[in-house]
């Protein structure tokens, strides 16, 4: 046997290459011959490779080792075999007691040994050097956006990684293990906190699990092991809602992420990427994500001299307006148009016009209920009025003004009972070709009355001549017809002569009849009395026609006003509806965000 030849006992071989610390902890020095050492090493290496390929467990390997030792006992001298058997018995006892485990468990136990590692200590051997924490985030789902409470709730996946110089190891000493998993509460982790979270207890929002360690032995920088902490979180954070353009609003909800106790001299936060991962996000039917970007800002507070590194994650979302268009805007516009049409539909009776007032009151009640539904979703702020509220205010004003104007038209319609004709100016306004073509034509009965009473201009009358005058008129020559001046002059002169002759003949005949019919004076008086009776009947008929004319004039004026107001209000309502439907296409606006500094 050669001196100073040290062989790690069977425990080192069974642990598959443990480091010096394990040897110091469990090992023992023995002196073996070169032949013995070489033979046992060859046997161990061959059986170790065989057991590794065949995934042999510890019990099978123990049985093989026991059988091999029994077979080789006779080949060695009694002294060495006695020592080997004793060492084998001690190994079997410790193996049965569970003191020898696989490489991964041994690695974890040694890394987290309280005598070697302290989780409250900064993970840098030089404490003056800050620990760089790289942070990334993936948005999984937008759970809720509460405009009234001005908060948003999201489901995100957080990833933080940094380097810990006290957790590094050599993979050669641990079966080439480059990565392992350890409980998060047994290592140092940064106190990353969401500043604007509505939940103060972090355990209720973050589900921390295990941390992943990756050796830094192969890294040339020698920064230590890479620690990666991945966990899901449900954050409910306060978000100032800007709903002035509701339902076309865009919201910018900012995540303020930083350490609560460490400034830049201890922890330096950096975003792993400038944008948040949206690849795994579940679709939201109400909101559309426009952007989700990280911004790194160094801020100085009054409490501390050193700056604090803050990570701002700006989540910009846009509301999908289809739901509100279908359930609020379209029904409101239809109700308004129906109400306006009912207000200003021409009617002839007063009872029908009275129903318009009840229609206006019912429509106002409907608008108030629908506006209340919108107000329940809006934040209680006096800074601005949402676009949807302006829409309902405008619609309510249309209904109110329409109701008042319908009352005015009703009052105009009631003037027909006073038998007072309308003024000539108003008559000229409502009876002209423009109004007749674009708005409303007067009824035929009213035109006949206007013609009978001479209201319509003389150009609309036909000139009728007495047949006796036409019989005594001389024919007009073709030469006179060719010259318009002589034509009208000839007619005028003949008319004057004939009228003079006709008047003289008529007066002479009247005097002759008076003298010749003196005997019939009594009958004549009877005839005069009968004619006076006919005249009073004619006056009554004329009065009735005058009343009819006044009634038709006021009704026609009310109908013209109804038609004009109907066109104006329907056009206004339709224009507001089109503007609101296409508001997002007609107008563009931007959501404010803090300055981007890195």
UniProtKB/Swiss-Prot annotation:
Disulfide links within the chain: none
Recorded topology in the membrane: Multi-pass membrane protein
Name the record gives this protein: Acetylcholine receptor subunit alpha-type acr-5
Chief location of this protein within or outside the cell: membrane
Gene encoding the protein: acr-5
One GO term (biological process): regulation of membrane potential
Entry's family note: Belongs to the ligand-gated ion channel (TC 1.A.9) family. Acetylcholine receptor (TC 1.A.9.1) subfamily.
PROSITE patterns: NEUROTR_ION_CHANNEL (PS00236)
Single GO term (MF): transmitter-gated monoatomic ion channel activity involved in regulation of postsynaptic membrane potential
Keyword Cell membrane part of the UniProt annotation: yes
Record: glycosylation sites: 54, 71, 77, 134, 178, 252
Sequence ranges on the Extracellular membrane side: 17-323, 378-391, 585-598
Signal peptide (UniProt feature, chain positions): 1-16
Localization per record: Postsynaptic cell membrane; Cell membrane
Keyword Aminoacyl-tRNA synthetase appears in the UniProt entry: no
Family annotation (InterPro entries): Neur_chan_lig-bd, Neur_chan_lig-bd_sf, Neur_channel, Neuro-gated_channel_TM_sf, Neuro_actylchol_rec, Neurotrans-gated_channel_TM, Neurotransmitter_ion_chnl_CS
Residue ranges crossing the lipid bilayer per the database entry: 324-344, 357-377, 392-412, 564-584
Keywords from the named record: Cell membrane, Glycoprotein, Ion channel, Ion transport, Ligand-gated ion channel, Membrane, Postsynaptic cell membrane, Receptor, Signal, Synapse, Transmembrane, Transmembrane helix, Transport
Function according to Swiss-Prot or TrEMBL: Subunit of nicotinic acetylcholine receptor (nAChR). Involved in nAChR sensitivity to nicotine. Modulates locomotion towards the drug nicotine.
Positions in the Cytoplasmic compartment: 345-356, 413-563
One term under GO cellular component: neuron projection
């Amino acid at each position: 046997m050669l001196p100073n030849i040290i062989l790690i006992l069977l425990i080192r071989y069974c642990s598959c290459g443990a480091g010096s610390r394990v040897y110091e902890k469990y090992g023992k020095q023995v002196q073996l011959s070169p032949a013995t050492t070489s033979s046992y090493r060859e046997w161990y290496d061959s059986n170790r490779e065989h057991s590794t390929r065949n995934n042999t467990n510890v019990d099978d390997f123990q049985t093989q080792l026991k059988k091999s030792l029994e077979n080789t006992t006779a080949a060695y001298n009694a002294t060495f075999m006695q020592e080997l058997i004793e060492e084998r018995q001690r190994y079997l006892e410790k193996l049965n007691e569970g003191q020898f485990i696989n490489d991964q468990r041994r690695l974890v136990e040694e890394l987290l040994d309280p005598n070697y590692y302290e989780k409250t200590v900064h993970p840098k051997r030089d404490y003056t050097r800050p620990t760089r924490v790289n942070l990334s985030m993936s948005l999984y789902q937008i759970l809720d956006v509460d405009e009234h409470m001005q908060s948003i709730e999201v489901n995100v996946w957080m990833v933080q990684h940094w380097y810990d110089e006290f957790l590094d190891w050599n993979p050669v000493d641990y079966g080439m293990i480059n990565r392992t998993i350890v409980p998060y509460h047994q290592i140092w982790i940064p106190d990353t906190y969401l500043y604007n979270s509505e939940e103060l207890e972090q355990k209720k929002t973050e589900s921390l699990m295990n941390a992943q360690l990756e050796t830094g032995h192969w890294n040339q920088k020698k920064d230590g092991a890479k620690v990666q902490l991945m966990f899901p979180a449900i954050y409910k954070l306060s978000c100032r809602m800007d709903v002035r353009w509701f339902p076309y609003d865009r919201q910018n909800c900012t995540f303020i992420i930083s350490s609560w106790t460490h400034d830049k001299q201890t922890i330096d936060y950096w975003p792993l990427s400038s944008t948040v991962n949206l690849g795994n996000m579940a679709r939201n039917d109400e909101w559309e994500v426009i952007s989700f970007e990280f911004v790194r800002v160094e801020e100085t507070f009054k409490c501390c001299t050193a700056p604090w590194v803050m990570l701002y994650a700006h989540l910009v979302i846009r509301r999908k307006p289809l739901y509100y268009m279908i359930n609020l805007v379209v029904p409101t516009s239809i109700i308004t148009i129906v109400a306006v049409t009912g207000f200003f539909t021409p009617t002839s009776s007063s009872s029908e016009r009275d129903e318009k007032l009840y229609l206006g009151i019912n429509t106002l009640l409907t608008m108030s209920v629908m506006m209340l539904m919108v107000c329940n979703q809006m934040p209680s702020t006096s800074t601005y009025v949402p676009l949807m509220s302006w829409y309902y205010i405008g619609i309510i004003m249309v209904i109110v003004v329409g109701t008042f104007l319908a009352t005015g038209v009703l009052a105009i319609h009631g003037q027909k009972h006073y038998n007072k004709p309308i003024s000539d100016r108003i008559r000229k306004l409502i009876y002209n070709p423009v109004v007749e073509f674009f708005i409303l034509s007067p009824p035929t009965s009213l035109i006949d009355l206007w013609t009978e009473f001479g209201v319509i201009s003389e150009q609309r009358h036909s000139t009728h001549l007495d047949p006796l005058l036409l019989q005594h008129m001389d024919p007009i020559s073709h030469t006179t017809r060719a010259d318009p001046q002589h034509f009208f002059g000839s007619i005028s002169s003949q008319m004057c002569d004939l009228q003079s002759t006709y008047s003289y003949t008529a007066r002479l005949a009247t005097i002759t009849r008076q003298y010749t019919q003196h005997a019939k004076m009594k009958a004549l008086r009877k005839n005069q009395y009968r004619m006076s009776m006919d005249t009073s009947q004619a006056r009554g008929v004329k009065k009735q026609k005058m009343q009819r004319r006044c009634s038709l004039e006021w009704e026609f004026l009310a109908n013209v006003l109804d038609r004009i107001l109907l066109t104006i209000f329907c056009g206004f309502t339709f224009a507001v509806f089109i503007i609101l439907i296409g508001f997002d296409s007609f107008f563009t606006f931007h959501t404010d965000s803090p300055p981007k500094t890195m």
